């Protein structure tokens, strides 16, 4: 089976993580999974949501959006429609859950970190790229908090990354781009820690049910791919 991109079944797209991409945010990253490009910023603010006031712990949340021409044809801005779409809400909740799993919220004090993920070009895997890049932006925000004496102890538990896998033309493949994603029999997104701990699995049989053996094949590919992505994260954080 030849993938449209010519990649091997277990091969990630070209990955790059560029830190300090914008000027103002406490953490900012441009993350590229092939032709999918996302700007991720992390903003540190005093205070927490109402349900956490007085609890002595912090909060991490996320917002997600796509530029109108991040895709082949222009999409209307959700702000112009006056409401977010269901897909947007689902993805930003996933990003928030994934990043909260990366930190010990009790060590943040009553501070909030808001992650903004803005897709500037989409070619499949925007949510997985967002999570992977946002984790690096989050680490930079935590480092800022330590330098500024806002917190005393590093709250980072582990790096978190995400990748897509799927069944394409009867074979398990890693890191689907748009041509594969739109024609896959199964599409799955996995979020894991750098130690291989599972945070979330989202999987859907698009064309036909998938077997337990196929699931194991996809899981194995995802675990290996996320291990590679975490190495990209570590390398970027030492630059």
From Swiss-Prot:
- GO BP, one example? tRNA processing
InterPro entries associated with the record = ExoRNase_PH_dom1, ExoRNase_PH_dom2, ExoRNase_PH_dom2_sf, PNPase/RNase_PH_dom_sf, Ribosomal_Su5_D2-typ_SF, RNase_PH, RNase_PH_bac-type, RNase_PH_CS
Report the enzyme's class at the first EC level: transferase
Q: What Enzyme Commission number does this protein have? A: 2.7.7.56
Give this protein's Gene Ontology molecular function annotations.
3'-5'-RNA exonuclease activity; tRNA binding; tRNA nucleotidyltransferase activity
Sites binding phosphate sit at: 87, 125-127
Domain of life the protein comes from: Bacteria
Reaction(s) the record says it catalyses: tRNA(n+1) + phosphate = tRNA(n) + a ribonucleoside 5'-diphosphate
A Pfam family annotated for this UniProt entry: RNase_PH
The task this protein performs is described as: Phosphorolytic 3'-5' exoribonuclease that plays an important role in tRNA 3'-end maturation. Removes nucleotide residues following the 3'-CCA terminus of tRNAs; can also add nucleotides to the ends of RNA molecules by using nucleoside diphosphates as substrates, but this may not be physiologically important. Probably plays a role in initiation of 16S rRNA degradation (leading to ribosome degradation) during starvation.
- Family assignment from sequence similarity: Belongs to the RNase PH family.
**Record note on quaternary structure:** Homohexameric ring arranged as a trimer of dimers.
Put simply, this protein is called: Ribonuclease PH
Origin organism lineage:
Bacteria, Pseudomonadati, Pseudomonadota, Gammaproteobacteria, Cellvibrionales
């Amino acid at each position: 089976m030849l993938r449209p991109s010519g990649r091997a079944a277990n091969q990630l797209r070209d990955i790059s993580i560029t830190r300090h991409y914008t000027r103002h945010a406490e953490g900012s990253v441009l993350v590229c999974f092939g032709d999918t490009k996302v700007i991720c910023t992390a903003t540190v603010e005093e205070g927490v949501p109402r349900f956490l006031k007085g609890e002595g712990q912090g909060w991490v949340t996320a917002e997600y959006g796509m530029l109108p021409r991040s895709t082949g044809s222009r999409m209307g801005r959700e702000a112009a429609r006056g409401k977010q779409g269901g897909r947007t809400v689902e993805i930003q909740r996933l990003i928030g859950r994934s990043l909260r799993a990366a930190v010990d919220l009790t060590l943040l004090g009553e501070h909030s970190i808001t992650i903004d993920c803005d897709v500037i070009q989409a070619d499949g895997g925007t949510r997985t790229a967002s999570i992977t890049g946002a984790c690096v932006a989050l680490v930079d925000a935590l480092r800022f908090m330590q330098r500024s004496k806002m917190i005393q102890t590093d709250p980072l538990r582990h790096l978190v990354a995400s990748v897509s896998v799927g069944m394409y033309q009867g074979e398990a493949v890693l890191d689907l781009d748009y041509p594969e994603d739109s024609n896959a029999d199964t599409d799955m997104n996995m979020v894991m820690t750098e130690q291989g701990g599972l945070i979330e699995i989202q999987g859907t049989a698009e064309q036909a049910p998938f077997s337990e053996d196929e699931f194991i094949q996809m899981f194995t590919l995802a675990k290996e791919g996320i291990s590679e992505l975490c190495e990209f994260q570590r390398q970027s954080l030492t630059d």
